[in-house]
Curated annotation (Swiss-Prot):
<protein>
    <recommendedName>
        <fullName>Peptide chain release factor 2</fullName>
    </recommendedName>
</protein>
<dbReference type="GO" id="GO:0005737">
    <property type="term" value="C:cytoplasm"/>
</dbReference>
<dbReference type="GO" id="GO:0016149">
    <property type="term" value="F:translation release factor activity, codon specific"/>
</dbReference>
<dbReference type="InterPro" id="IPR045853">
    <property type="entry name" value="Pep_chain_release_fac_I_sf"/>
</dbReference>
<dbReference type="Pfam" id="PF00472">
    <property type="entry name" value="RF-1"/>
</dbReference>
<feature type="modified residue" description="N5-methylglutamine">
    <location>
        <position position="254"/>
    </location>
</feature>
<dbReference type="InterPro" id="IPR000352">
    <property type="entry name" value="Pep_chain_release_fac_I"/>
</dbReference>
<keyword id="KW-0648">Protein biosynthesis</keyword>
<dbReference type="Pfam" id="PF03462">
    <property type="entry name" value="PCRF"/>
</dbReference>
<dbReference type="InterPro" id="IPR005139">
    <property type="entry name" value="PCRF"/>
</dbReference>
<comment type="function">
    <text>Peptide chain release factor 2 directs the termination of translation in response to the peptide chain termination codons UGA and UAA.</text>
</comment>
<keyword id="KW-0963">Cytoplasm</keyword>
<comment type="similarity">
    <text>Belongs to the prokaryotic/mitochondrial release factor family.</text>
</comment>
<keyword id="KW-0488">Methylation</keyword>
<dbReference type="InterPro" id="IPR004374">
    <property type="entry name" value="PrfB"/>
</dbReference>
Length: 367
C-alpha cells in the first residue's frame, strides 16, 4: 500500500469530519435529536392510532428526522471506526481489508453528499408530497403530444425516485398526448425536488405528425405545488366556492361514467380552478379537489410573501407560470435550462425521467 493512498484516505476522513461538524450546526442536529426522541415517544403511544391522520403525520416526521439524525450518527461512528481500521490494515499489510475501508469511506461520502443536498430544501413545504399540473399550449396535436411527453417524463422521474404517483385528472388529446393532467406525487421531499420545474417548457423537433417533416415548436406549462397537511392551516370560506359536477371523460371526450362523478371547484376570489375525476365516487373526487385547492392557495400565499424578497435579489429569475424555463431541441440533441445554463445532450435519458442534473443545478443556484 502506497503512503500517498493512505494519506489521501486519512485526508478524506478529516474532510468528512469537518463537513459533518458544519452540517450539524446548519441542520440543528441537537434540536432534531431532541425532537426525534419526542416523536418516538408519541409514535409508541397506543392512543395515537385512534387518529390515523395524526399517526401518519408523526410517522412522516419521524422518518425525516431519522434520515438526518441517524445518518449523522452513522457518519461520526464511521469516521472513527475507519481511522482505526486504516491503522490496523496498514500494520498488517492487509490490502483486502484496506480496499474494504476505501469502499466504506466512499459510502460515507455518498451519505454526506445526500445530506448536503438536503440543505438546499429551505422551504417549509419542501418535505411534502406535491401535485403537478401539466397543460398543453396552443398548437393542437403538437402541443398535446408534447404535454403527454412531459407527463411521461415526470412519471418516470417519480418511479426512479421510488415515489408513488396517482393520476387525479387527465384530459386526453384528440389524436395524441394530453390536453391537461394533474398528478399527485407521494414521497419524501417530492415538492422540494420538483418545485423548480414550474414554468413553460419548449420543444423543438421535426414533427411526426407533419407529412412534410417540418420543424415545429411546441409549448406546455408545468405547475408544481405542495400537498398541505394539517400542520399548515388554510382557511376556505364555503361561500367563496362554486362546485360543478360532470361526467368523467376519456379519449376523444367520450364519457366513461354514467353518473356525474367528476368534480370541478372554482375559488371565486382568486379564480383558481381545480378538478378531479380519478374516482368513481363524487365524494372522493370532491375531497381530493379540496386538497388540491388548499395546496394551490398555500402556494399562492407563499408566492405573495416572497414577491418583495425576490424582487430585491439580483440575478434571481421569476419562475412564474408564464416563464419559459427549459428548451428541448431534439434534432440537435440538446436540452438547456434557460435559468441555470445547465445543458445535456442525452435527450432520450432526460425524457425518460433523468432530471437529477437539472434539479440539482436549479436548487444550487436558488432558482
Amino acid at each position: 500500500m502506497e503512503a500517498e493512498v493512505i494519506n489521501q484516505l486519512n485526508n478524506t476522513l478529516n474532510d468528512l469530519e469537518k463537513r459533518s461538524e458544519d452540517i450539524r450546526v446548519y441542520m440543528d442536529y441537537q434540536g432534531k435529536k431532541d425532537r426525534l426522541e419526542e416523536v418516538i415517544g408519541l409514535s409508541e403511544d397506543p392512543e395515537l392510532w385512534n387518529d390515523p391522520k395524526r399517526a401518519q403525520e408523526i410517522g412522516k416526521e419521524r422518518k425525516i428526522l431519522e434520515g438526518i439524525v441517524l445518518t449523522l450518527d452513522n457518519i461520526a461512528s464511521g469516521i472513527e471506526d475507519n481511522r482505526m481500521l486504516i491503522e490496523m490494515t496498514v500494520e498488517e499489510n492487509d490490502e483486502e481489508g484496506f480496499a474494504a475501508v476505501q469502499e466504506d469511506v466512499a459510502g460515507l461520502e455518498k451519505q454526506m453528499a445526500d445530506l448536503e443536498f438536503k440543505r438546499m430544501f429551505n422551504q417549509p413545504a419542501d418535505p411534502n408530497n406535491c401535485f403537478i399540473d401539466i397543460t398543453a399550449g396552443a398548437g393542437g396535436t403538437e402541443a398535446e403530444d408534447w404535454a403527454g411527453m412531459l407527463f411521461r417524463m415526470y412519471s418516470r422521474y417519480a418511479e426512479r425516485k421510488g415515489f408513488r404517483i396517482e393520476i387525479l385528472e387527465e384530459d386526453d388529446g384528440e389524436i395524441a398526448g394530453i390536453n391537461r393532467a394533474t398528478i399527485r406525487v407521494e414521497g419524501e421531499y417530492a415538492y422540494g425536488l420538483l418545485r423548480t420545474e414550474t414554468g413553460v417548457h419548449r420543444l423543438v423537433r421535426y414533427s411526426p405528425f407533419d407529412s412534410n417533416n417540418k420543424r415545429h415548436t411546441s409549448f406546455a406549462s408545468v405547475f408544481v405545488y405542495p400537498e398541505i397537511d394539517d400542520s399548515i392551516e388554510i382557511e376556505i370560506n364555503p361561500a367563496d366556492l362554486r362546485i360543478d359536477t360532470y361526467r368523467a371523460s376519456g379519449a376523444g371526450g367520450q364519457h366513461i361514467n354514467k353518473t356525474d362523478s367528476a368534480v370541478r371547484i372554482t375559488h371565486e376570489p382568486t379564480g383558481i380552478v381545480v378538478q378531479c375525476q380519478n374516482d368513481r365516487s363524487q365524494h372522493a373526487n370532491k375531497a381530493a379537489a379540496m386538497e388540491m385547492l388548499k395546496s394551490k392557495l398555500y402556494e399562492l400565499e407563499m408566492r405573495k410573501r416572497n414577491e418583495e424578497k425576490q424582487a430585491l435579489e439580483e440575478g434571481k429569475s421569476d419562475v412564474g407560470w408564464g416563464s419559459q424555463i427549459r428548451s428541448y431541441v431534439l434534432d440537435s440533441s440538446r436540452i438547456k435550462d434557460l435559468r441555470t445554463g445547465y445543458e445535456v445532450g442525452n435527450t432520450k435519458a432526460v425524457l425518460d425521467g433523468d432530471l437529477d442534473g437539472f434539479i440539482e443545478a436549479s436548487l444550487k443556484q436558488g432558482v
